[in-house]
Amino acid sequence: MITDTIYQQFGHLLNRSERLRTTVLVLANTAGCLLMLSPALSLIAATSSAIYIYNHNQGPLDWFMFECMLGVTAFSAYLTWQLLNIRPEQPEGIRLKPEQSPEIFEMLERRANHFRIKPVTHINLSTGTELKIVGTPVWAVPIYHRHTLCTGTPLLFFLGRGQFRLGLAGAVAVAANKRICLSGWLDQAANDWPLIISALKSNDSLLPRLLLKPIDWLATHIEHLSIRLRADWRQQQSRWVLDNSDEQNTTDYLASHLVATAFLDKQYWPMIFKAADRSPTPVVKAFSHLPLLLHKTLNKKHAERWLLEAQTFGKQQQTGVRDLLAELRIDHLAWPGLPAESAFDALFSNKEILKQLDTYWQNTIETQWRVAHTRYKNHEFRFNQLKKSAQEQGLRGESALKFVKLAPQFVDRQGAIAIYKEMYNNNADDAKVCFACGLALLRSSSVDAGITALQHAATLDPALAKRARVLVSEHRNAWVDEEPEHQTTTMEHATA
């Protein structure tokens, strides 16, 4: 009991004192480094001891100690060799060659020289929307790093050439600052430990079995203690952009970055993965078709809604956006639209690199795609069973709930609405089914029927009344999406 109280008080003190938190982080990261380097340190100590004893041998006992030191040296050398063969995973993506886009390499070299840092020679084109220099440990110790410029290919279609140059300069500036300050090393180490743990887990040798548990324990506490530190460093690039550019350029860059991320997560990838319903292997050319699909499916209304969500909703990754805008005294973000000439078109003379990225993405996503296809086929089989049962004898309880849940995947909106109403009428005495049908009707834009079903569910079970009121209120205040059938049809035509 006393120990728990002391632990809680120390935790509160850590939350209040940044200096204490930094001190604990330094100690924890140093302990982790020493633990990972323990085989090499033991090798040095045992070898030195063996040499000393050999040179000062005075009897049988010294010979025994010498032989013991030789054994410790051999064992330490074995563990050190295993340590050298544990390599954390490098950033995802395909390696860009200088001849594919010489201008990007020239930009990066000029910026590295300007900030007086070691040249970054590796550039990866990834499938995300990042634009940053990523340091990854060469070995399983967060000390020596290989630095790579990671550029999200989709982001290049949302930025103009000038915006890309501005973002690249900010990325190099952050990398330069991170190398010369203590908080930068702590942030880098906090990002390194998950990679090191993943490398230890994927290696079945003796050293990972000895070190995994203590390193995992340390990494868990380091991650918790460095939450604020990492959040602050995530915003350093945007702060640099504002300090070295005008407010309009900064807001345009931030808005384009947020819209690109939201477009991929909320619209593009769900639309692409619909093809898993038809094909067991990923045959869609997600990046070769991206420019066409981007102009066909993205509109101003969606972009403004995503920006509003980023500035108002409480997700952890979006909280930093609100804090940054408040710190920079920016009232709101407005999307400037897609550039007349994207950074990709300006920096790449041909689109051959997109075909390489298609192949890389298809190989990377193959397992996940196969799982999605299998899940769809299982759902399709279950839906057909429930549909047959509904026609023959009707559905009740859990079967009705499952039928309502699966309906949007296999019938159009009008067909789904008919199913929701049928299940509601057949289960008018079941609060859970009525609530599920009401929610599904609201999402299908059948507002009056949805509200009626939710109110009836609240009558059957008063515990659902508050949730029903919240859902109705949220729906009345929500932005209206385009019908998903339009997006699916667009993708099918474009990828045919």
Show where each model-derived region lies.
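Post-HEXXH active-site segment of zinc metalloproteases
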Residues: 177-212, 252-258
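Cytosolic-facing loops and C-terminal tails of multi-pass membrane proteins
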Residues: 1-16, 206-230, 243, 247-448, ...
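Transmembrane alpha-helices and immediately adjacent membrane-cytoplasm interface residues
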Residues: 61-90, 109
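Transmembrane-cytosolic junction motif
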Residues: 78-96, 224-233
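Hydrophobic alpha-helical transmembrane segments
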Residues: 44-72, 205
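Peri-catalytic and regulatory segments of divalent metal-dependent proteins
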Residues: 83-192
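An active-site-proximal "capping" alpha-helix that borders the catalytic cofactor pocket
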Residues: 109-113, 169-177, 194, 229-250, ...
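Canonical alpha-helical transmembrane segments of integral membrane proteins
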Residues: 27-51
